[in-house]
């Protein structure tokens, strides 16, 4: 893929999340996908759907803004901002706090055969926990 095609694929994968349809994962990722999230590795469609659905349940008004998309070789990098209100219970964030959060992150997408086969996700999870009042601010 060209750098522009890789950037477009990474961009569209994020835009699909805004549609809140976990089944769109199959459009951008192969069945053996691997996401390296800050606190766990997600492998395959079922784990990916569960991970995304849990996040949508916790933050039903989630808004994702792509700040930058760059690409070279078989990788694309996205820098984004996620905003949302904690309205659903999850194992990670507990019962709803009703608080808003905003977090910036970066994802490295590795692309093969027109699909994103592996991602490395980095964002400040501590900041999210502090904004939700789950841990004290420092």
Sequence positions of predicted segments:
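C-terminal and inter-domain tail/linker signature
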Residues: 1-138
């Amino acid at each position: 893929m060209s750098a522009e095609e890789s950037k477009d694929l990474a961009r569209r994968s994020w835009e699909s999340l805004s549609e809140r349809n976990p089944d769109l994962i199959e459009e951008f990722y192969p069945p053996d996908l691997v996401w390296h999230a800050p606190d766990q590795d997600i492998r395959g469609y079922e784990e990916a759907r569960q991970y995304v659905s849990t996040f949508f349940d916790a933050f039903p008004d989630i808004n994702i803004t792509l700040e930058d998309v760059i690409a070279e070789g078989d990788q694309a990098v996205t820098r984004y901002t996620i905003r949302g209100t904690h309205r659903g219970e999850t194992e990670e964030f507990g019962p709803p706090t009703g608080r808003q959060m905003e977090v910036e992150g970066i994802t490295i997408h590795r692309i093969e055969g027109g699909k994103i086969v592996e991602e490395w996700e980095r964002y400040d999870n501590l900041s999210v926990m502090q904004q939700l009042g789950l841990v004290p601010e420092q």
